[in-house]
Amino acid sequence: LRRARFPHDTICLLDGGNTLCGPDDGKAKDFEKKQLKEKAKLIVESYNRMGYQSMLVGHHDITLGLEILQECEKMAKFPFLSANMRYKDDNSRVFAPTTVVECKGLKVGVLGLTIDTIPEYYLERANPDRPLVLTKAIDEAKSLIPELRSQCDILVLLSANSAETNREIAAAVPGIDVIVDPLIELGNHKVWVDEELSMEQLGETLMVRTDAQGARLGTLDIDWIDGGRPMVSLSFDSAPPAGRSTYWYERASMEPHLLEDPDIMGLVEAFRKGSAFVNIDALPELPHKDKYLTASTCSMCHVEQTDFWKGTTHADAFASLVETGDQWRQDCIACHVLGYGQAFIAPEEAEPYKNVQCENCHGLNPGHPQDPVNHPWGAVKETSCLTCHNKNQTRIDFVFSRERRKVACPPLKRN
């Protein structure tokens, strides 16, 4: 952000949503939600310090419940936007639909549209006492954009809808200068956006996309001339026609070598230290704890397989979290231990379950040690791996046939 601000007096900093919660946070158990809530508040406070000016409400942002999201909104020094998220009972809006931001003498109007194809049950679960609905994004755009256009110089639409819907909006509603499309792909979440998909000219509207999960920061540098629509890209035309506004769009990678901001890291370290605290008295019972054998039990008979396992990355999975101080984060730990939330919760009970062990891959089979003939282990299934090795978790493709060979134990010698 400092690099983006350096050549400019000011920037307009916007977020495309699905920021505060992850896609699986709605499945979190009660004891996990407190930490996930603190993580969401950490993100909001970080955004406050970075100077964000608005954030679209994405459908993942309500997975911990509307009440928690509204607590975060009260903390924020910037508006949460969604023109089409409404209460079902009276059709009133839950969040502000628009905002106008002053940016270097220009007024930037921002309209937020949440993806409008989310199932009704998901919205009801987010606020059971007063269920939510999502109206059609294109209808809200048609209703609100003419008035917003009269209040601003540049009009930006934050729309977490499908590319097809965003194209329909651009074609049907004149006056939109920029659509920021967070590229939502339900069922097949895509983290990296190909270069040819990062920009799209839709008549007089420019649609831009950047990568998910904070992988890259999209920056749109506009040299605005009143009446100079449509804008011309300097990457294609170094000598644009007179009187036309110009833009330059690029995505800056969030590389590991970038210096960490001490103020933000102070917030992160405080969160990490607090993540190790678990109220023992408030923990639920763990009725399935006795079903877990752990690798120590398996090692008594399967010596060769245990020796092989110790040389794999699975055997050091917990240590990789310790290196970053994230070992007690509830959104990380489950993929680095055995049986989190089923066999143990409290840190002081974690020792036998650390690392990715036999049962992470093979499943539970508590009767095997006493009667291996009648309780054999089945083959490892790809679905066991995909619980953790998916793009939401790792940002990379997982090829089961290739990766399995790296961790597959030597075959047993049968008598």
What are these regions (language model features)?
Residues 60-61, 229-232, 236-415:
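Short sequence/structural segments immediately N-terminal
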